[in-house]
Design a protein with these regions (language model features):
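Active-site and NAD+-binding cores of ADP-ribose-processing enzymes
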Residues: 139-291
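Short basic helix-loop element that most often maps to the first helix and adjoining turn
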Residues: 4-19
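ADP-ribosyltransferase catalytic core
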Residues: 66-67, 80, 97-107, 113-175
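DNA major-groove recognition helix of helix-turn-helix/homeodomain DNA-binding modules
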Residues: 8, 41-61
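Recognition helix of helix-turn-helix/homeodomain-like DNA-binding domains
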Residues: 24-40
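Beta-strand-enriched accessory nucleic-acid recognition/scaffold domains that flank the catalytic cores
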Residues: 1, 10-11, 49, 75, ...
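ADP-ribose/NAD+-binding catalytic cleft of ART/PARP-like enzymes
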Residues: 49, 58-104, 123, 276-291
């Protein structure tokens, strides 16, 4: 965290003594922080957060820049893809496909192309960890789901939204989409998209509106290892330390993005109105023998 504190001082144009006065600590304390001999406690980091907010210090951007720099320093052999994984309590032991079954693509080990997305999922947890990982795709059976209604329906299946049409060919199509596959690749339901897709499932927007938002948001991709073979192809390259201060800023951005999702959903409703089908209409059509 010593680098971040130096960057904060630089943005605020403060000396160590001046920062110490603002934080109500000693010069020696700030000096120890910047020389990595001590870490600010939560109270000090909360005060740092307030000072950074007042001084418009771009801590969120500084954090992403740190992560990007670390990622760029990693050299990978051919066939491996660099990704990010956020964990609420850290990865211990063997990597396994053991997330909640109700996640977007079911039970698996989730990785993504966007560091910011991985962080927003874990920023509320004190013991959370961010990892830069890689996965070797060479010998894996992979299915990539397009960023359209196919993606939404696969998510609907895994979130238990299709149970009323269980037994239909439509249901079985999505149940079996990743059958015998080691890895599923598809769009990430980020903070903004999460709200939009929920509005689709509860019947506030149509499939046309959903697909329109998928296109407009240009989402990153998630790679999900759904078998042990897939998980065995994953390697943790490094762990990125995230301070309480950084997580406070990440939490703020996540909340802002959720608010943008609410606004986006409203705009989509206005733009598409009755174009397309609502989720329940799609299920009713499937139950009655339609595709």
């Amino acid at each position: 965290m010593q680098t971040l504190i130096k960057q904060i001082r630089s943005h605020l144009n403060m000396s160590q003594t001046e920062l110490a006065e603002h934080l109500n600590v000693t010069f020696a304390t700030v000096n120890r922080w910047e020389n990595d001999r001590a870490i600010p406690n939560k109270l000090a980091q909360t005060r740092l957060y307030e000072i950074c907010k007042e001084g418009a210090v771009p801590v969120y951007d500084l954090t992403l820049s740190k992560i990007k720099k670390t990622a760029e320093s990693i050299s990978l052999p051919a066939g491996r893809v660099l990704l990010y994984h956020g964990s609420k309590s850290g990865v211990e032991g063997k990597i396994e496909p053991k997330s909640r079954p109700q996640c977007d693509f079911g039970k698996g080990f989730y990785m993504g192309t966007e560091a910011s997305q991985a962080i927003t999922l874990i920023c509320d947890y004190d013991k959370s960890k961010l990892y830069i990982v890689s996965v070797d795709l060479t010998d894996l059976d992979v299915v990539e789901v397009p960023a359209d209604i196919e993606w939404a329906m696969l998510v609907a299946y895994h979130r238990g939204r299709m149970e009323k049409i269980n037994g239909t060919p439509f249901y079985e199509k999505y149940r079996d989409l990743a059958k015998n596959k080691d890895l599923v690749i598809g769009s990430i339901a980020n903070d903004r998209m999460f709200y939009v897709i929920d509005n689709f499932f509860i019947g506030n927007i149509t499939d046309a509106a959903l697909v329109g938002s998928l296109s407009a948001l240009q989402l990153g991709k998630q790679y999900v290892a759904v078998t042990q073979k897939g998980c065995d192809a994953v390697k943790i390259e490094t762990e990125i330390e995230l301070s309480y201060l950084e997580r406070l800023f990440m939490k703020e951005v996540a909340e802002e993005n959720r608010a943008k999702g609410v606004s986006l959903a409203g705009e989509i409703c206005r733009n598409y109105r009755r174009e397309g089908l609502f989720f329940d209409e799609i299920l009713d059509k499937a139950r009655n023998g339609g595709a």
